[in-house]
């Protein structure tokens, strides 16, 4: 209790404008306890690793704090200190602990500013409760993208250089000691092989990535978007509500105005060349979409400015293939696990005036979303549910489990896929994925009982695993009474759910990797 009160005292320092408080928190045990409690709901390494009990975990934290303090103190005087001996030895357990603890520390000033900002936005946040679902993005696409023509499909570039991250963090935190410590940690990270998550997990957003890297990446993306929104507002002379999130930036507008001046001087282009009020920007994780109604000249201008922004301000080389200019009614956009594009539907109307009859073709614009079958089969192949050709195979790792457990696991995967891809315009691809999982479930049970598929299905009957194909209809029947929707048209149509807050695990993420400076 005393430690939590002490923690509250440290948080109150922000109100008195004392910013030099982050560094001492590194040597407080309760910081690592908070990191441990936060990690219980994540796939991070807990403090009790390798058979440690709570008592030995506390001793491990004390030992880590002692070694950290001694090593930092000695590194001030020793010029040729070995970075691999920062905590005594290369130990992934200790490195994960210090990573999680430091991530809690650097998040404190951001959390305080965010809470203060949201206190004045409670009414607006209550109105936008449904928009917390990532499925709410697609109704936004349907309402706003159907009358647009061109889309910039952007993958935010990487790698992130350590010094760029320190510079970004300096805009937010005025604690010099913490900045030096952050720089020290970053260079240590790039020298410690044990601190970098194995390359088998390529996505920065995977649950196996340390919280520290997620925080640094989000800080980098937010810095990029802050400048991007500033350029967007300057070009259209409109103020975006997103600019309200710029808390206490150090001479932010002056810095960005200098950046704009550099753009004008170095590239001999003016911002008025891409002025247009109809422009929409959407981002999820490392993928963003920029849509406009104008001709390709505008999109080429934005591509040109984004590439130069990344190269000259963030010192990141953007590969040409990371930005694509797509025609909304000719090319597909891969976003949030869906293939989306505009579609023109022709409606023929027969009209008659006096004795003359004629047909009128009316073109109606719609936004179409479909399930990408090839990436999903690739994910199922990686998860060992099928081979590279899409042929179902058994799941040998579940062979020791009970029949009910195996069926429940497969049913849960099918249920989540149906729930996530319920907004697909065409269900045929989704039915194929369900078929793969259904046969994989049968083969897993057959492998366990050392039988054949024919004998196994004959013994259980034809109703076995029918719920693989009827689960979505069952859920919709609970939401919409059949008396209101007597036909099956509802089940074939698109349904967006507002309770989905994260992307499905089987949807491929964009690859992300951090390289040393």
From Swiss-Prot:
Localization terms from the record: Plastid, Chloroplast
Single GO cellular component term: chloroplast
Keywords on record: Chloroplast, mRNA processing, Plastid, RNA-binding, tRNA processing
Main location: plastid
Gene Ontology biological process: mRNA processing; RNA splicing; tRNA processing
ATP-binding among keywords: no
Signal peptide as annotated in the record: none
Gene Ontology molecular function: any one: RNA binding
Residue ranges of the TM segments: none
Record InterPro entries: Domain_X, Maturase_MatK, Maturase_MatK_N
Protein task: Usually encoded in the trnK tRNA gene intron. Probably assists in splicing its own and other chloroplast group II introns.
Family assignment from sequence similarity: Belongs to the intron maturase 2 family. MatK subfamily.
Entry-linked HAMAP family: MatK
Protein name in the entry: Maturase K
Gene: matK
């Amino acid at each position: 209790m005393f430690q939590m009160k002490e923690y509250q005292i440290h948080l109150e320092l922000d109100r008195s404008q004392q910013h030099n408080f982050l560094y001492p928190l590194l040597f407080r045990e309760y910081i690592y306890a908070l990191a441990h409690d936060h990690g219980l709901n994540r796939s991070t390494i807990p403090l009790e690793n390798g058979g440690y009990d709570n008592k030995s975990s506390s001793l491990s934290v004390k030992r880590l704090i002692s070694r950290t303090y001694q090593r930092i103190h000695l590194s001030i005087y020793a010029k040729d200190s070995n970075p691999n001996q920062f905590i005594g030895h290369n130990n992934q357990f200790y490195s994960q602990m210090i990573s999680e603890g430091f991530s809690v520390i650097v998040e404190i000033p951001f959390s305080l500013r965010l809470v203060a900002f949201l206190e004045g936005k409670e009414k607006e946040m209550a109105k936008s409760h449904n928009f917390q679902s990532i499925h709410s993005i697609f109704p936004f696409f349907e309402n706003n993208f159907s009358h647009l023509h061109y889309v910039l499909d952007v993958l935010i570039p990487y790698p992130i250089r350590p010094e760029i991250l320190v510079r970004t963090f300096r805009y937010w935190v005025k604690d010099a000691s913490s900045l030096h410590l952050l720089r020290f940690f970053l260079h240590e990270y790039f020298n410690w092989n044990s601190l970098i998550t194995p390359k088998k997990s390529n996505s920065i957003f995977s649950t196996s990535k340390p919280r520290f890297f997620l925080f640094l990446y989000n800080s980098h993306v937010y810095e990029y978007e802050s400048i991007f929104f500033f350029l967007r507002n300057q070009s259209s002379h409109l103020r975006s509500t997103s600019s309200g999130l710029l808390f206490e930036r150090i001479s932010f507008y002056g810095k960005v105005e200098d950046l704009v001046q550099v753009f004008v001087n170095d590239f001999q282009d003016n911002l008025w060349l891409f002025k247009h009020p109809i422009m929409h920007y959407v981002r999820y994780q490392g993928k963003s979409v920029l849509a406009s109604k104008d001709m390709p000249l505008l999109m080429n201008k934005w591509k040109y400015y984004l590439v130069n922004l990344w190269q000259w301000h963030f010192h990141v080389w953007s590969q040409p293939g990371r930005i694509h200019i797509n025609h909304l009614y000719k090319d597909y956009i891969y976003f949030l696990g869906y293939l989306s594009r505009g579609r023109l539907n022709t409606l023929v109307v027969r009209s008659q005036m006096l004795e003359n009859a004629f047909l009128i073709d009316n073109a109606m614009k719609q936004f179409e979303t479909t399930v990408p079958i090839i990436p999903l089969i690739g994910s199922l192949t990686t998860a060992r549910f099928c081979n590279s050709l899409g042929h179902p195979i058994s799941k040998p790792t579940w062979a020791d489990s009970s029949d009910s457990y195996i069926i429940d696991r497969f049913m849960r995967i099918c249920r989540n896929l149906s729930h996530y891809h319920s907004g697909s315009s065409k269900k045929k691809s989704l039915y194929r994925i369900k078929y793969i999982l259904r046969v994989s479930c049968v083969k897993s049970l057959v492998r366990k009982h050392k039988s054949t598929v024919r004998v196994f299905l004959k013994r259980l009957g034809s109703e076995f695993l029918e719920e693989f194909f009827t689960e979505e209809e069952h859920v919709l029947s609970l939401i919409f009474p059949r008396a209101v929707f007597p036909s099956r048209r509802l089940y074939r149509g698109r349904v967006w759910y507002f309770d989905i807050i994260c992307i499905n695990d089987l949807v491929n993420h964009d690859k992300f990797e951090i390289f040393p400076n």
